[in-house]
Amino acid sequence: LPQQPVLPILFERLMMKNVTGYLHSVETAGALDGPGIRRVLFLNGCPLNCVYCHNPDTRKYKGGTKTDAFTELRAIARQKEMLLSMKGGVTLSGGEPLWQPAFVKAIFEGSKMMGLHTALDTSGFLGKKADDELLSFTDLVLLDIKHFDPDAYKRVTGVDLQPTLDFAERLSALKKPVWMRFVLVPGYTDDMDSISRMAAYAKDLGNVERVEVLPFHKMGEYKWEAMEMDYALFDIQEPEPDLVTMAKSRFEDEGMVVF
């Protein structure tokens, strides 16, 4: 463990509290989920049923490996110097990490005590589970908004859009930095009117530092087949570059920084 006296005290407290969680996998040097090089923990459990989900194996809450915050913080501590030197930190993703809010809070609290940047990758649907203390340990929220039309959102995800918007507005009120993410799926999320309204909404929030337009890909298709699940997007191809450019331009028209 690192030598700072506060860390063993924190870890001992976590051991006593026995904060457990279910983990799907860990990426030790991620470069896509927040600034710098990051340790990314993918948590199990998700209430959404996104038709284009590339990690359907994370949906089941207890489908992953049971772990505890003490164990995971020890692993983070071993990477601390590298993460700091690469201007990175720790990202919790999923699945939907807010299905395990106590675990998220413990990991982020420990990470902040090590001086590490923290990022939460979430759909926002369970935003009410993120209390103010959890958000105080969160430096950045990667907010995935799947669609801006409520009916289309429900068709794509199986759940309502409003909880995500409520969470977005709460983050705005807190002035919590947000990177908004939007997956562009031909025939499902490519309605330019809806994208324009999403772009205007992102601008009005005032705390969205950047927007990432992520082209749909088929890399998770084999997981659906392996799990014998019906994959609705089997015949859907990845979006053409012109479509991606058009979607990005709607955000750029609102003055947003777009990737």
Model segments located where?
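Short glycine-enriched, charge-decorated loop/helix-capping segments at active-site entrances
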Residues: 57-61, 154-160, 228-236
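Short, conserved loop/turn and helix-capping segments at secondary-structure boundaries
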Residues: 66, 158-161, 238-241
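Conserved AdoMet/S-adenosylmethionine-binding subsite of the radical SAM
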Residues: 73, 77-89, 93-219, 223-225
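Canonical Radical SAM [4Fe-4S] cluster-binding loop centered on the CxxxCxxC motif
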Residues: 18-19, 25-27, 31-67
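Auxiliary Fe-S-binding modules of radical SAM enzymes
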Residues: 10-30, 186-259
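Cationic, low-complexity basic patches in intrinsically disordered or flexible, solvent-exposed regions
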Residues: 4-5
